[in-house]
Design a protein with these regions (language model features):
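Mature N-terminal segment immediately following signal peptide/propeptide cleavage
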Residues: 23-60
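Scaffold signal of the M16-like zinc-metallopeptidase fold and its non-catalytic homologs
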Residues: 81, 86, 128, 135, ...
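Acidic/histidine-enriched alpha-helical segments
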Residues: 94-97, 140-158, 223, 242-256
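An aromatic/glycine/proline-enriched structural segment found at the starts
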Residues: 178, 182, 186, 215-280
Length: 301
């Protein structure tokens, strides 16, 4: 009987790590395999045993362009607040340090992402995936944390305001996009950020931080089968949301002539920036356009 109980306990531990037959590959290109969980989460696995590390990146398809009037800076604020933890993971940064994870997050126009790199280790991988899954729907997003984090956000604002290159970039975008949110700073307007309503911020979180609005990428050294099973185990229990994401329909009118911006600052080195409306990221010409910007704008060797 003792042997049977031990064997049964072992089976309980091992069986969840066998990838469910229901989760089948959607596509596979150049060593990257895509899966789609029933709740809508997109998963990309790119194993490479030649690497000593594992990198995990969870990207939400929400950025500053999804913010409405009075909400500027919300996507960036949420990025900060997610690191304040969940009931099951209340001390996120302490865990990062203890486990040797190099982790952070970033916010941009179209997305917010959370990422970590660490020496290949299944225990750390399992822990980080568990935190990412828990943070998707159970982050505190509390008023007390917002108040304490406001100092950090203000410092970021002031650093940007004191960076001539960044300010010129923001002024250029605002001239390129008069109606679309691409013309607004990702960090937001100071009045919106300092006066943010916590209930409105929580609603923004519940709307966008859902499995059907996210892509999870694991790359580097890891066991693909066991990792997929971990992902299904930790993310699969999150239900597919019933809400529909609002349709963004604002289009920038065709530009009808050259626009110019002059930014005057005391001292410093004069800077010039030229910007053009180009092709979107998924366009076949995007790679060539990116290469052209490097050829024309990069510092000569």
């Amino acid at each position: 009987m003792t042997f049977f109980l031990r064997l049964f306990a072992g089976l309980l531990f091992v069986l969840p790590l066998a990838a469910p037959a229901a989760v089948q590959p959607v596509a596979s290109v150049e060593g990257i395999t895509e899966y789609r969980l029933p709740n809508g989460l997109q998963v990309l696995l790119a194993p490479d045993d030649s690497k000593p590390t594992t990198t995990v990146n969870l990207t939400y398809r929400v950025g500053s362009r999804h913010e409405n009037y009075g909400e500027t800076g919300m996507a960036h604020l949420l990025e900060h607040l997610l690191f304040k933890g969940t009931p099951r993971h209340p001390t996120v940064w302490a865990e990062f340090n203890k486990r040797g994870l190099r982790a952070n997050g970033s916010t941009w126009l179209d997305r917010t992402n959370y990422f970590a790199s660490f020496s290949a280790n299944e225990a750390n991988l399992a822990w980080y995936l568990d935190w990412l899954a828990d943070s998707m729907t159970k982050s505190f997003i509390a008023r007390r944390d917002l108040d304490s984090e406001m100092t950090v956000v203000r410092n970021e604002m002031e650093m940007g305001e004191n960076d001539p290159g960044r300010m010129l970039f923001e002024k250029t975008l605002s001239a390129m996009y008069l109606w679309h949110n691409y013309g607004k700073s990702t960090i937001g307007a100071r009045t919106d950020v300092e006066g943010v309503d916590i209930g409105r911020l929580q609603a923004f979180y519940r709307l966008h931080y859902q499995p059907d609005n996210a892509t999870l990428i694991v790359s580097g050294k890891f066991d693909a089968t066991r990792t997929l099973a971990l992902i299904v185990q930790q993310f699969g229990k999150i239900p597919r949301p019933k809400r529909a994401l609002p349709r963004l329909y604002t289009l920038e009118p065709t530009q009808d002539g050259e626009r110019a911006v002059t930014l005057r600052r005391i001292g410093g080195t004069p800077q010039l920036m030229a910007a053009y409306h180009g092709v979107p990221g998924a366009h076949p010409d995007q790679a060539a356009a990116e290469l052209l910007t490097l050829v024309m704008g990069d510092t000569p060797a």
